[in-house]
């Protein structure tokens, strides 16, 4: 009883710390984008890093409380997605030295985190899955979804900024956004992370299935949609480097590709796949 109360208190503490850090980070990024305060942007990045740390421990406490992986249900999967989305964005921010899009990314991170925390627990039994191989398979798969989601956000920013520039509606906020070329490169970087993650994650998934059933070719509709996602994003990277497709067309294709990812993560997982309900 005492342990259960302590675990509940820790979960509540990490929830509050994560929420406060993410909200503060969002405010910092907005201050940087709207007012151009450099210290505000740095504070946003710092609070995002602190939020990632608190969110990680929240996932860890959730796993301990459930005595299983933290993503065996929809809430856990969404929470992990939000954490990996924030992690991917912060990595991209540091790599490209550009933090002005943080104000657009943090609302999605907050939405996934809050959805996971406020949704009712899933009463479905956890799948008979365990082991390091399975854990890496799921984590890398959700990392790929998060990276593809980030590329979609960046592509939407690209399309919005391009439209404002063409309409000559240029204000201080637009000037603080990354250049169109940098947004394009950031989107491609995010897609590359997603492709590497989903490729390795898929291979690990086949290895795990072979160990579990002895039949690596056991059919699952998820295999087909995953192959389609891989082909779609490889096609995007190819066209994004073509002068005739670079820019707006490539960004539109990136948004369309993420619609396939959403279809895979929702419709295919929930209604067609036997072993990929939440990842």
What do these predicted regions represent?
Residues 127-142:
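Active-site glycine-rich loop that binds ribose-phosphate moieties when present
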Residues 166-181:
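Juxtamembrane inter-helical linkers in multi-pass membrane proteins
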């Amino acid at each position: 009883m005492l342990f259960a109360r302590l675990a509940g208190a820790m979960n509540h503490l990490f929830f509050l710390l994560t929420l406060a850090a993410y909200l503060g980070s969002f405010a910092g990024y907005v201050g940087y984008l709207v007012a151009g305060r450099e210290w505000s942007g740095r504070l946003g990045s710092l609070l995002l890093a602190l939020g990632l740390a608190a969110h990680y421990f929240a996932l860890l406490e959730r796993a301990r409380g459930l005595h299983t992986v933290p993503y065996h249900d929809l809430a856990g999967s969404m929470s992990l997605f939000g954490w990996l989305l924030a992690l991917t964005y912060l990595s991209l921010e540091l790599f490209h030295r550009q933090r002005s899009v943080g104000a657009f990314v943090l609302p999605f991170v907050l939405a996934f985190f809050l959805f996971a925390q406020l949704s009712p627990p899933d009463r479905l039994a956890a799948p008979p899955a365990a082991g390091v191989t399975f854990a890496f398979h799921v984590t890398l798969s959700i990392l790929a979804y998060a990276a593809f989601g980030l590329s979609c956000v960046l592509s939407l920013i690209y399309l919005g900024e391009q439209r404002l520039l063409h309409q000559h509606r240029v204000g201080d906020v637009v000037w603080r956004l990354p250049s169109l070329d940098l947004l394009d490169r950031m989107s491609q970087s995010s897609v590359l992370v997603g492709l590497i993650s989903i490729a390795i994650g898929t291979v690990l998934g086949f290895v795990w299935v072979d160990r579990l059933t002895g039949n690596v070719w056991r059919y699952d509709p998820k295999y087909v949609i995953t192959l389609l996602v891989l082909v779609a994003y490889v096609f995007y990277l190819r066209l994004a480097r073509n002068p005739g497709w670079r820019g707006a067309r490539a960004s539109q294709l990136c948004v369309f590709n993420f619609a396939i990812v959403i279809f895979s993560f929702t419709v295919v997982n929930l209604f067609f796949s036997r072993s990929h309900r939440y990842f």
